[in-house]
Each structure stands twice: as C-alpha cells, then as structure tokens.
Design a protein with these regions (language model features):
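Structural/interface elements that position substrates and couple domains in central-metabolism enzymes
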Residues: 1-248
Length: 248
C-alpha cells in the first residue's frame, strides 16, 4: 500500500519505518527542511533502539520518502496518518492547532481515489469528527475519503518492538471500508483486532494512558511506604502483581 505520515516526531517516524519495513511505500511529511535532510541521511533524529537500522534499510530499499511537500505524497496515498503533537495548553487542554491545520492542508491535496485519514495523535473525544468536517469543507469535490482513529500504544525504549509486536490494534470508524483498509495494512502484525466506534477509539487511548499513570503513581506511593517501614518494594509489587485482577 502507499501511505503517508504527517509528522516525523516520536510516533510518526517509528510507525512509518515499521510500515515501510513491512513492504509499503511510505511518505513522511515534515515542516523543517533541516530535519528532512537528516532523516534522508539515515539519522532518525530521536534515539530509539533499532530505529536507525530499520530507517537505513528502508531508505536503501526506497520504501520510505521524506518531504515537506504535501502534493508529493497525499494525492497517491491510500491511507494518511496524522501524527503531529497535541501539547497541553496552560489550562491543561490539548492544543489541537497543528491537528486542524494539517487536516486542512491534507484536504486540499486529496486525489480522485478513495483515501482513509487516520489519527495517530492523542486527541480528545470528538476531535476526529471535527477533522472530518474540516476535510469535507476544503477537499476537491471529487475526492472520496473516510476518517478513522487508530491510536498508538508505544513505550519509549521499546517503541520499535512495540510497533512490530503490538498487544492489540484498535480501529475506530463509522466506515466499514476504512476499517477494512486499516486491517489490511496491519495484517502482517500480531495482536488482537479491536473494531470500535470512532469515539470509543479516542477514549481507549486516553483511558490506557490514565491507567498506566495511575499504576506508576501507586507504585511510587508503595515505594515510599516500603522505605518508611523496612519492606522490600520489589517483593511487595511482585506479591501484589501476581493477582490476575491487578497484574505487575
């Protein structure tokens, strides 16, 4: 398949390299020419074990192409992933400026064929509906598209392995056609397929992040109590984690 990632940050570059390694033609769109040149030279910009090797292998095979030009990538792409940052504002809300700006730019360059626009970024519930509205208003009249949410679940330090061997693949969309295309793209990968509504996929990502943060906070509290009482934190966490309802 021919796919595009808009954004070459942590999620974008790792996922793009993995899908290229699976035999797809992958475009990566970025805003900064200097970073594009580094990526083209085999420098992944970020450090992640195994990433540079995968990047260089697919540059050599000409399966991954970096560009600043939407018109080079978007018209021929079957699936377009949004992978730009959504940093928090001062009030804690996600800043969706980049997401909506990218959606508008994508819409202007859509080809005549059918495309799936899928959000990889962590976004609040309802964002994908807004993305759909933006694209609908700005696309060429003959462009056909659907929107889907396909959240990532990567860990720093094991992101490449997590992408090659996911626990699950979550696809949220109202469109059966979009779901089938995303399932086709992910077919070489293991993991359970979870097909849900658009909003459910958005909440799955936020809920997963929240549970992981809660577990870390609780483990820190247990560690503090162990220091005060002379208990061994690893023994305690192992003892608690063996409960199948909880996990380590």
């Amino acid at each position: 398949m021919t796919i595009t990632f808009v954004g070459h940050g942590y999620v974008g570059i790792v996922t793009a390299c993995v899908f290229a390694d699976l035999g797809n033609t992958v475009y990566v769109i970025g805003r900064t020419p200097e970073k594009i040149k580094k990526l083209e030279s085999g420098d992944p910009i970020i450090f992640e074990p195994g990433l540079q090797e995968v990047l260089k292998r697919n540059l050599l095979a000409k399966r991954i192409i970096f560009t600043t030009d939407y018109n080079v990538a978007i018209p021929s792409s079957e699936i377009i992933f949004l992978a730009v940052g959504t940093p928090p504002k001062e009030n804690g809300e996600a800043d969706l400026t980049s997401i909506f700006s990218v959606a508008k730019e994508i819409s202007k360059h859509l080809g005549k064929h059918y495309s799936v626009i899928s959000c990889k970024s962590t976004v609040p519930v309802g964002t994908n509906r807004k993305i759909k509205d933006i694209i609908e208003k700005n696309k060429p009249k003959n462009a056909l598209f659907d929107v889907a949410s396909c959240p990532e679940f990567l860990r720093e330090g094991t992101a490449v392995n997590d992408t090659f061997f996911p626990d699950r693949v979550v696809v949220g969309s109202d469109s059966k056609r979009a779901i089938q295309m995303l399932l086709k793209l992910h077919k070489p990968l293991p993991g359970e397929r979870i097909i849900v509504r658009l909003e459910s996929a958005e909440i799955i990502k936020y809920a997963s992040n929240s549970i992981l943060s809660t577990k870390i906070s609780f483990a820190n509290l247990v560690s503090f109590l162990c220091e005060k009482t002379g208990a061994d934190v690893e023994e305690v966490l192992d003892g608690v984690g063996l409960d199948k309802r909880i996990g380590r």
